């Protein structure tokens, strides 16, 4: 049921001087309140989705010429009566207009309160509400496409289908309980297990997609590591196409890390050029840099390990690869200085999964970028794929997967329907958390507080 809440106001456009600013109002009687200070047409008599020119006046003094956009309930973003005032973007004018309406009883909106009201009034579910924030924050084509797909209900539809199938399974189990005395079997155990395994496959794919979704939403931190003087800084400069890092033939020049962002295939890749790794150094500052490199490796989403094809031995390279593989972090092996490579070493490494480049001559850098996209399956991204980008969704999916696995285990062990229903209802609960069908006031307050004011 729709309900009009107390009227709220917020600046919907960024603060600061601009040609135009938009002030947003929503809630009970906002159209009548705006009409009190608007000189133009009687707004109370105008239809929804219309725009009207006039002036905002206070105590006989004009504050500004404005355009008023009317949105009457339920045909608005919040599904309440809403008004958007387009005025000149002077900070004085904005402050004066907002102060005027606050004196008339309209309070300042909390962060995300407009979207929260839209959710509470049933305009969309919690997934779609969160997608609004993701859409505003999107600064790459992939992030925009993913947020738009979720805002339009793609993920919600998939979860709803899952819930309906689970409810069907639950209904079969409940029927058997109702007819327990007649010993009627409505749910063949093998059929039930097969159906649940099908649902587990769908949930599993959604969980797996989070590693990609996290990269799409938050970017990919990439640590460039290797021994001193293998060309790490030259690689960073080549990728950036500018001289950002100091390049020197003297080993150990990079004492600290240098960060730079590059957009590769629509993904924000944050490259970190680290101090060269070597076991023995008498330089205290270099030792600190090496320690920081190891910290950065642990924090990275991807490691690019650079080897010098002109100088290093096969045994040294193999030992380094063995060490880095133990970290459990995705990595790409890069052989640099291809133009001066040792023939025997190049031949031996050609049998392995290496990317061979020459940073000095800027050769094959595109192959490295392609490998990054391939590693995270960004080269195979389908517009219809549902990708989990939100940590909250991921955690609830993992919990629902565990609960559903408990149902399968119960079926195998011959547990009663009453016990199976406990885990099945728990699965439905966790899926309901994602869409907002199951939620708490604290969760909503925390979630919407992360939105910008005015949205």
From Swiss-Prot:
Q: Which residues bind Mg(2+)?
A: 233, 254
Documented EC number(s): 3.6.-.-
Q: Which organism is it from?
A: Amoebophilus asiaticus (strain 5a2)
Q: Where does (6S)-5-formyl-5,6,7,8-tetrahydrofolate bind?
A: 24, 84, 123, 455
Q: Which gene encodes it?
A: mnmE
**Essential cofactor(s):** K(+)
The reply to whether Hydrolase figures as a keyword in the UniProt entry is yes
Which family does the record claim for this protein?
A: Belongs to the TRAFAC class TrmE-Era-EngA-EngB-Septin-like GTPase superfamily. TrmE GTPase family.
Q: Where does the sequence pass through the membrane?
A: none
Task: State how it assembles.
Answer: Homodimer. Heterotetramer of two MnmE and two MnmG subunits.
What GO CC annotations are associated with the protein? cytosol
UniProt: K(+) binding residues: 229, 248, 250, 253
Described by its record, this protein's role is as follows: Exhibits a very high intrinsic GTPase hydrolysis rate. Involved in the addition of a carboxymethylaminomethyl (cmnm) group at the wobble position (U34) of certain tRNAs, forming tRNA-cmnm(5)s(2)U34.
Using the record's annotation, list all stretches that form the TrmE-type G domain. 219-377
- List the Gene Ontology MF annotations in alphabetical order: GTP binding; GTPase activity; metal ion binding
Q: What is its main location?
A: cytoplasm
- What is this protein's record name? tRNA modification GTPase MnmE
Q: What class of enzyme is it?
A: hydrolase
